[in-house]
Amino acid sequence: MNETVRVAKSAASEDVLPLMGNEAIARGAWEAGVKVAAAYPGTPSTEIMENLARYPASDLYVEWSTNEKVALDVAIGGAFSGARAFCSMKHVGLNVASDSLMSQSYIGVHGGLVLVVCDDPGIHSSQNEQDTRLFARLAGVPVLEPSDAQEAHDFVKLAYEISERFDTTVIVRSTTRLSHTRSAVRVGPRETVASKGFVDQPSKTVAIPANARRQHPKLVAREQAIAEYLETSPLTHWEKGDTKFGVITGSTSYLYVKEVAPWASVLKLGAAYPLPEKAIREFAASVDRLFVVEELEPAIEKEIRALGIAVEGKALFPRCGELSPELVRAGLAAAGVMAAAEVVAPLAIEPMARPPVLCAGCPHTATYLALRSLNARVAGDIGCYTLAAVEPLRSIDTTVAMGSSIANAVGMAAAGEPRPIIATIGDSTFLHAGLPPLVGAVYNKANITVVILDNAITAMTGGQDHPGTGRTIRGEKTFKVDYETICRAVGVSWVRKVDPYQVGKLLQTLREATAFKGVSVVIAERPCVLDPVKIKGAPLAINASGCVACQSCMNLGCPALVWSEETYEGRHKVEIDQGACIGCTLCAQVCLSDCIQPVAS
């Protein structure tokens, strides 16, 4: 096995830059000569395509796709035409793209094709913490796991060599810690890669049963060939140390192992699938006890057990959540191979809890306050507005996945739910996965209301453009989708637009919508208060003498509203943080004592 994990580059052209993991991935793709790149934004992957878009348009085509399947299909099309293609997404996005991935794994590639998937161990900003390595095994494609930003850069470049050598899509798996950690990265120039032209071979590129039956055995043989390649690849790295115990690991877990047990023998696997069997057997034979340290699922551990090798893993290290040096040390200590960490007294002062809230002036705030007053059953979706599931708005009953709200609402109505049934979905999410269930709802004569929360941006992931903004990822003007036109085109007869800042009109519109028999659509239309620029109007103030501490304004959950030291009949009055207030007037509209007024300029 080679003793290096770095991809060789010309020293004369090297430079060192402080890059975040996602920036390093983008840089690696650009250096690899990528010509076609597509993605759908999703934390922790978003910055990859944003950074690729900063490179010249003459170098590569980049796009925000309407969803992850579309993004992967765009990349597959680029590879069919002989160009190096790139796609990125978060882990749950791979669920959406998996239909294409599973077929593409049989077909293979022409130009190199790399798919970067960013997992979210610890569920910082996702619905789950699924493990992409299991998808790679299911699809029969290799998955590389960099452990730091330098490897993120290098592994992407190496992935193209593997992709073209073995005629396969290659997944590069990142994680939240890797994607959002910054470190020094040695970079190089862009490689000039000539396009191979379109692959005119229907027996390979057309996925029909007759072709697929021939290609499946080739996929199996390819897996075996890649496993053999990994035996001597720089991705497989043996660090010899104490033979009392050895650790097989990869990704960021490798760094944790090196921090807590630098003397241990370590087999670092830069590829989590397929595995280099000979290297693993040789390493296992060289140590007294063998451990696998991996985040989330026991993917490597199970493969090693299937080889008949005695190994210890998830019995010692947690299967749920992120790993850390502390957890790795605790697991090894529980195994009796190293001392436990010294007990450190906790901080005497507990840090102040700051639960996530919608921004001051967020247009979604009024929408969900109105929905709560209707006593409706609300199916939610994925976006900033999911925060309305908690107090004080607490008006969302379900949230499953992108686009689930509308079909969930149809199911609730079909099951006989007596309350009004309302689906709430953001503009970007509606374009991502909301159209098919809306068509289905109309076709199947469902009795539901759909509220499209149109804030003219993909806000949750940092303000990315989509087909409803009229701008491309490079800021170029383009066609702007009209939601009312779409809804009417698929058969929705009752469609209304409303400004959520007009609380009274909003509430009346929602009442009319829920009274309509059939599918009704309300488009709550107002730009996000943060994107493209922060909106800042004249702030408001509360006349303390007029405040009767009814606290109705606090039901908005606005972070600009804070408790006052003054009280009225034992209840705290409210103040407005004028630095945070944007002057939306929502609090003034719900104030029962009419004591909230704009501050005079």
What annotation goes with each model-predicted range?
Residues 2-22, 26, 146, 150-358, ...:
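Flexible, low-complexity linker and terminal segments
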Residues 1-149, 240-241, 263-266, 306-523, 533-535:
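Thiamine diphosphate
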Residues 59-60, 118-122, 139-144, 312-316, ...:
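Short beta-alpha connecting loops at secondary-structure transitions
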Residues 120-169, 175, 206, 210-213, ...:
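Conserved thiamine diphosphate
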Residues 57-66, 107-118, 200-204, 443-456, ...:
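A glycine-rich helix N-cap at a beta->alpha junction
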Residues 48-51, 74-76, 97-101, 123-130, ...:
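Short acidic, glycine/serine/threonine-rich loops at helix termini
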